[in-house]
Amino acid sequence: RGEAVLAWKLVVFSAAPLGDFLTLVGATSGKLLLQENRIAFDTGSALVYAPNPIQESGNLGLSDAGDAASNALDNARLAVTLLGLDPGIGTLKGEYVDLVGLAGGLAVPDADEVSRVYNYDRADDRFEQATIYHSIDSIQRYFHSLGFDDDTGAVNGIRDFPTLAHAHWNTADQSFYSTG
């Protein structure tokens, strides 16, 4: 609004959620004026389905074939930038998604690339991890860009902390979300 306001400045360094948070609170109103995470996160790149190979290719005849790689399915992958990755590690853990912190599930190798390039074909178990990271992170960033956040008080799925995810929890259909 262009007017000077007396404010309290709070700086919080946090491990969970990871961040260097700057918060400005109006000294007389007590209203939140600004809150932002000023930590520097890393970026990476990956080949993912966004949103899925049938929609991307228009080919209704595509089938899973037990996660086998094929030219048609590999050609449906898109090159994307992975945002918000935690610095100093190669796994898919970041500002809005954590694919390594959830114990349990099937024993598959983590996508762990010091280069931050996660280009796998779909026969590689790590391909699903890159796709899930990109999908959840993109959705959370989109919601935040609309002005939604986790500060509304109501449980709304908009998170200011990482969503724990596991790409290979079991061998059944995993197209579900659980808040528990």
Enumerate the language-model features and the residues they cover.
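Zymogen propeptides/activation segments of proteases
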Residues: R1-G180
